[in-house]
Amino acid sequence: LASRYGMHSELMGIELLDSPIMSVRTGLFHTSNGIPSHYLRNFYRDAYEIVRLHMPETKMVVFSASGHPAAWKRFMSGSKYKNVCMDIHLYHYRDDMALDITTPRGLSSAIARNRRLIDEAASAGFPAIVGEWSGAAVFTNASITPEGCSAFERVFISSQMASFTKARGWFFQTWKTEKRIAAWDARVALGTLERAMLE
């Protein structure tokens, strides 16, 4: 990709690997399943060198935080690494941190989590890109009407966008879904927002 598109003016950068699952310590003697972090670090350093042969330093080299931005502190901190950015995926529907956003506490906790992860990337020494996010969330209140669900999704989406102010940019998960699924289809999810919110 870098040799083919690296000099194109339209290219902003290249992500080295999308969404690898990194092994992390879960206790004193246990680690989760995934790729050991030292393998990922070596891969990213080697890939950076190869990509930079074909792509100028004005273009970003992006690597995935693998869900753990704080784990990358002091990584690629040498002066030879230029314009390196961390990709953070911010989903709220399926992981251990998923909360019911139909409560004020759940909504504020979800948004605080976004801000915390973006701040962790900055503390690790990297600008962040929200490489994937959606309007999908947990709705545990069975009495919500379809209209109420739409209102919660709109508040959730606009609140998430407001939480991205410290990120270099964001990418909604999907531009278009086959059945126009509101939480996953950018045309539907972002369509009801005022244009000023998208700029």
Task: Pin down the residues of each PLM region.
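Extracellular glycoside hydrolase catalytic/binding regions
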Residues: 3-6, 10-13, 17-161
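Aromatic-rich peripheral "rim/lid" segments of glycoside hydrolase catalytic domains that contact
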Residues: 145-199
